[in-house]
């Protein structure tokens, strides 16, 4: 399958059409952004690492019964996916307090959240992805009540699968975001799962192994991403 026209250019990925109206090609770039795209830098190998990381994770989720848009890996930084009608709301699961939750509520970073928190955010960079709830989704027609319930169920199921995967690799899955869409009317997991959209800490040292290394200018971003990939069994060569 060959890529045709550029359909959309995001902060770290470019989406291309193909000869089929049902499929797209995602190209993972080396760009890394923070502050809603106001700060952007490039890191060698990042596109390759995130592409293979995402492919690995999506396959794990498929094996667990979570439908994803993933079709097949095309190259080091490209993957073929189903074309979804994307829901304009992203789901966030929080197992420990970090990021915006700490700022918003003054909770100590690292506090265990039991049960895990499920948050919703409208995908709108210009408004800094405002937090919303189920009522907003229904009132504004962003997603039906039934499909939102399925998104929530799949988010928690993904959390169970991935928390165990990372725990066995000596890592804590602190939080992560998921994006869903519809394919032939069915809720399907789209976009990506990588250290760009999740928080991962080393279990012993609590070192941050995700994009917070870039946000907080800690250094060693790609080294951390590659270490996480190595621990969970992603082949990067």
Curated annotation (Swiss-Prot):
Q: Pathway involvement?
A: Purine metabolism; IMP biosynthesis via de novo pathway; 5-amino-1-(5-phospho-D-ribosyl)imidazole-4-carboxamide from 5-amino-1-(5-phospho-D-ribosyl)imidazole-4-carboxylate: step 1/2
Q: What is this protein called?
A: Phosphoribosylaminoimidazole-succinocarboxamide synthase
Which domain of life does the UniProt lineage start with? Bacteria
Record-level GO cellular component terms: cytosol
A Gene Ontology biological process term: 'de novo' IMP biosynthetic process
Name the family. Belongs to the SAICAR synthetase family.
Q: What keywords are annotated for this sequence in UniProt? A: ATP-binding, Ligase, Nucleotide-binding, Purine biosynthesis
**PANTHER family named among the record's database cross-references:** MULTIFUNCTIONAL PROTEIN ADE2, SI:DKEY-6E2.2
Asked whether the UniProt record includes Protease among its keywords, one would answer: no
Q: What chemistry does it catalyse, as a reaction equation?
A: 5-amino-1-(5-phospho-D-ribosyl)imidazole-4-carboxylate + L-aspartate + ATP = (2S)-2-[5-amino-1-(5-phospho-beta-D-ribosyl)imidazole-4-carboxamido]succinate + ADP + phosphate + 2 H(+)
Q: What is its EC number?
A: 6.3.2.6
Q: Give the GO molecular function terms.
A: ATP binding; phosphoribosylaminoimidazolesuccinocarboxamide synthase activity
Which Pfam families is this protein grouped with?
SAICAR_synt
Q: Could you tell me which species this protein originates from?
A: Proteus mirabilis (strain HI4320)
